[in-house]
A protein has these predicted regions:
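Glycosyltransferase-associated regions of secretory-pathway enzymes
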Residues: 1-56, 72-232
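Small-residue hinge/turn detector
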Residues: 58-69
Length: 232
């Protein structure tokens, strides 16, 4: 989204996806294959204001609900195949931050997953432009965390399973071992590294910037699609 070319460094990270999962298909989502005009008013307003990060929050969920697969932010470097993780209906990982909420740099699910359907529904009746003219800066991480808490999620550093959704929540070392203070904490569990390559918040919101350095600079939605439970 936004039409910017993906930088060389990020293309290097993306090459790691194909290196470790050569049989998977890589799909990019943008204005050519997603209809902004048909999206909820929240998405249209965010797009009109050039807030690509918030547009991508919705579009990644839409693509996953439609097709299933694994979504990666383009600043995610893969270290090994994700095949062993394809045992649950859906999976996501925590980010190492004070809030201990699930991050969105890596999301995996089967097509038509109820968890993702419920996340999409959160956007149906809200506006990006608030009545006073300000913009709704609520991140998808905040929305997701609050919604999952109603299903039993607890903000802590432990792996969790949300049975109602078939959702596995992995610890931060699986997908995002770099902490908000830039300390690398890889482990035997690590499948990928989130490099926090871009920023969409200002210095006033430094904690969120350190934790969610993604998307607006990248402006590309990448979905890795594969055959999941017989779905092409």
């Amino acid at each position: 989204m936004g039409g910017k070319e993906i930088p060389t460094q990020l293309r290097g990270y993306m090459a790691s996806w194909k290196q470790f999962m050569p049989e998977w298909e890589i799909h990019e989502w943008n204005e050519k294959n997603f209809s902004i005009a048909s999206a909820p008013v929240y998405v249209r307003e965010a797009y009109e204001h050039g807030k690509w990060a918030f547009v991508s929050d919705y579009v990644r969920l839409w693509a996953l609900e439609q097709y299933g697969g694994v979504y990666f932010d383009t600043d995610v470097q893969v270290l090994r195949s994700f095949e062993p993780l394809l045992v649950d209906t859906a999976f996501i990982g925590l980010e190492e931050s004070l809030a201990q909420l699930p991050g969105t740099c890596v999301i995996g699910c089967e097509p038509h997953c109820q968890w993702v359907k419920d996340m999409l529904a959160l956007y149906n009746d809200i506006h990006f432009v608030l009545p006073d003219g300000s913009l709704d800066q609520t991140t998808n991480v905040q929305r997701m965390g609050e919604m999952l808490k109603t299903k039993g999620f607890v903000a802590c550093r432990k792996e969790q399973y949300i049975a109602g959704y078939g959702l596995r929540v992995y610890t931060h070392d699986y997908f995002s071992p770099i902490t908000s203070t830039r300390v690398m904490r890889k482990s035997k569990n690590t499948y990928s590294i989130h490099h926090f390559a871009g920023s969409w918040t200002n210095k006033k919101h430094h904690r969120l910037r350190d934790t969610w350095l993604v998307r607006e600079t990248i402006n590309a939605l990448i979905q890795i699609k594969r055959k999941l439970k017989g779905i092409d």
